[in-house]
């Protein structure tokens, strides 16, 4: 999704991020590891936590990963005429260090994100058209917006410079018991405050114009999160990090990272739906009673249950998505009613009706992606030419003027709407889903620790939802479970980490 933002503002946004190594480090003398760990959800959060739990607890613990659909979760592909296309999380930043590490350690290959020129449409005309010449783009941006793009770069760079501290903290095995404490350790009160104000409010206070917000910032939010500049300021900044010309994806589909992590962690995949989780007292072979979690799940028409020492929930607990019942907890596990945003991804092979966007003859229309402003009356969030997950060189040349186009929209496109977009088309294949949280500051992130040894990863999505954030959450949950199991309280919620670690190489 972030590919469009890259083409749009990459001319002036260069995001320098701090690189940190991800080595293994010594810790306190651990007690005997748990016998069994359950992970609910086989997306990037669940599979990355399995990967790191295996590294921390060793080879003897049994790890079961439950998935009711396909491994990969919202890193999904859609098969169109025999070719697979990214329908969910599509691109990866060159300095997303966890994803970069996974690809390297799993022996996978990367492909560059689809290229091409981008335009911004306001419902009447193109208010910005990217040129293939860098200098011309700079002139266009400065002429229309002054130096606001440069100022925007500086704002985002400052936020991300702090955010990249998380890699150093995690490389030293530090964990956090809440999303807010993680955010505070990264950037203090100012960082946490980003969750409690809208992106528009933040940028207006910083002096950015309505024109710049409407034409440059809002379209990026719309394509990346299907929402407006009223999202929280932190997820807005994350969205703008897609302004990089070196975005990439995993050859064969980003979801194969998840299956690779499952295999690397020697986890047992259980294809079924978790129905309930309940704490119960069990008697071990030694005769000592111990608290464990009974996980009840359904495979096909059969219901089963197993007991686990530790449970990690790596799937949204919104009732429309997971529908897991937490039985007999005292106090009760909190309810999760925060809404998720509906998104419809549609792949259409057709000849674009370029006159809808420009009066230029179609043979002179060179845009490969179109973003739309908030004030347009368009029924789509974006439109772009895409390549399949196995096409290393990008989208193939047009055949009879036809490309495979990918659209994002809030609702399913009607035949009339598709016919308005395309002069002719061969097919339209769609996938509707609840893709990411609906952001509405002030943002309260769900708890990570639901019970003594019951953890929830997806609360981090309410700060920002993307592949790398899920991988960070997976690593954090694994470290948190490990340290709490072994009583390493000095490795949790340490606020002075930046000062303590900044002098280390």
From Swiss-Prot:
InterPro entries: FAD/NAD-bd_sf (IPR036188), Prenylcys_lyase (IPR010795), Prenylcysteine_Oxase1 (IPR017046). GO terms for cellular component: lysosome; very-low-density lipoprotein particle. Highly expressed in the liver, kidney, heart and brain. Keywords: FAD, Flavoprotein, Glycoprotein, Lysosome, Oxidoreductase, Signal. Its cofactor is FAD. The keyword Signal applies. It comes from Mus musculus (Mouse). GO terms for biological process: prenylated protein catabolic process; prenylcysteine catabolic process. Coiled coil: none annotated. This is Prenylcysteine oxidase 1. Residues 1-28 form the signal peptide.
